[in-house]
Curated annotation (Swiss-Prot):
Family: Belongs to the transferase hexapeptide repeat family. LpxD subfamily.
InterPro entries per record: Hexapep, Hexapep_transf_CS, LpxD, Trimer_LpxA-like_sf, UDP_GlcNAc_AcTrfase_non-rep
Gene Ontology terms, MF aspect: N-acyltransferase activity
UniProt lineage: Bacteria, Pseudomonadati, Pseudomonadota, Gammaproteobacteria, Vibrionales
Catalytic residues (positions): 239 (proton acceptor)
EC nos: 2.3.1.191
Protein name as catalogued: UDP-3-O-acylglucosamine N-acyltransferase
Keyword hit for Lipid biosynthesis: yes
Reaction catalyzed: a UDP-3-O-[(3R)-3-hydroxyacyl]-alpha-D-glucosamine + a (3R)-hydroxyacyl-[ACP] = a UDP-2-N,3-O-bis[(3R)-3-hydroxyacyl]-alpha-D-glucosamine + holo-[ACP] + H(+)
Enzyme class: transferase
Listed GO CC annotations: membrane
Pathway given in the UniProt record: Bacterial outer membrane biogenesis; LPS lipid A biosynthesis
GO biological process, one term: lipid A biosynthetic process
Gene symbol of the encoding locus: lpxD
Keywords: Acyltransferase, Lipid A biosynthesis, Lipid biosynthesis, Lipid metabolism, Repeat, Transferase
Amino acid sequence: MMTLTLAELAKITGGELHGDETVCVSRVAPMDKAGEGDVTFLSNPKYAVHLAECKATVVMLKAEQRKHCSGHVLVVDDPYVAFAKVAQALDTTPKPADGIAPSAVIASDAILGQNVSIGANAVIETGVSLGDNVVIGAGCFIGKNATIGQNTKLWANVTIYHQVQIGADCLIQAGTVIGSDGFGYANDRGEWIKIPQLGSVRIGNRVEIGACTTIDRGALDDTIIEDNVVLDNQLQIAHNVHIGYGTVMPGGTIVAGSTTIGKYCAIGGASVINGHITIADGVNITGMGMVMRSIEEKGVYSSGIPLQTNKQWRKTAARVHRIEEMNKRLKAVEKIVEQKKED
């Protein structure tokens, strides 16, 4: 079991320690469930009243909350960020694979870096290049001439199509498909003619992709995911989409083809983004947003209807359907008022 001393926690987080620097922790835990050997954190000041009851060995908090805690403490600028760093250091998640399984099928000309692991029944096709410390989970398929950078991990049954490029330090969860055909068809008098998708997908460094997400290859140019992007489960990223540095997308979002999303955007879950539009840097779209036109300025945008009781929602829906009629009536009243003013 991995253990860290308070002194080591201070080094990891950059925090200021108070207490015995030799005390050890081995787990991260929520404040109300933490006990001996646990490290916890306080990020919301309203929970400070519970510090007196907290049984954690170490608490990470801001300087202004220090007075509420008499035990071993780490004073940090951002307790939630500190928690994330400590959780990484104490992570017990197993590797997707360890060593090269006898049942893995690896092309003779595939290039494997040092310390590569490949799980059972994985297929590595001709021309593939895997960097140092790459981990390929059981049942994965890596297509011809694909490249995967060092320290990247793929969980079970991930499919990487031909010529896809994935950078270093990425994490891809189970069942995701990268590089499948984009939705490209021409209509010839009612008959659909498939357009071969001749581009690929380029994924940068430190990108995380959730389970069962699909990222389509470009029609001619590549679909591009820049560095430090985080994509959740069950997303659909269509062909030739370009997602900028540091953007995050929770689950269920659909991005139609040839759309560009800027840097540091946050796209709420279950959003739908139209194709061939541009979203500026720093845009925050709340959940269930429907984006039909380009967004040219950063800010927070919403379009989903917040939850109501069914009775309230039915009234709202009925009024929405009467908006055009109500607008005409309002204009008629305004016209009468203006005429009376003139008289």
